């Protein structure tokens, strides 16, 4: 019953109209009021995790786009998910083994260009859209933070430090201010969850929830500490693209919010935005 009351209270709060322009809000409040993250800008598409897909997400109203960061051998930060180039491009070998110029000559599958530089995404956003950037390796930490500093992006960029504490510590050795999201998962998830929460880090804004840590007690602990929670919507119920009429896409964001989670990470930002607009009716049930 208590969990149900908390979930309804969240739905009502999330449905309340914003009183300030989104890009004027502190990052945590911006995420609280606009709790939708477009996974790779929308997925799966040939141009997922690229500027063109992010622009499509922005045009349908997505407040946050998610991406993956890796480093070239000469220190340039790019958007790319896999360790190897061979599955998503016409090149082969480890991503980190190539220079920026070589990477940019690799064609992404179905596209006429290679992976985008993170700096290009910062230039495109300029705070209009929040950037949720997953740090795929320790080597990309400092160059990525340097770009956040250069563009004054502390209130519209946050980094995912994944599972465990290694990447979290790598970030904090270099920068105490940048906002973070952690994602404890796997056999040691509960230990990592407790350790991260005990740090009392005000800039660890978000804890991504997985089956090992999702409970009413943990949600209460996080919210009492002022932290936000997030979840991959497609892990709750499938998000599909129907290949037959009416060719619709279906997000699972309502299923995330019904559990009292703050932020839904979705493959289908347009449908997720429509679901967010229906929250007042959902809360009134």
Describe each region flagged by the PLM.
Residues 1-7:
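Bacterial N-terminal signal peptides that target proteins for export
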Residues 8-9, 19:
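Cleavable N-terminal signal peptides
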Residues 15-16:
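N-terminal signal peptide c-region/cleavage motif recognized by signal peptidases
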Residues 20-285:
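Phosphate-group recognition and catalysis centered on beta-loop-alpha active-site segments
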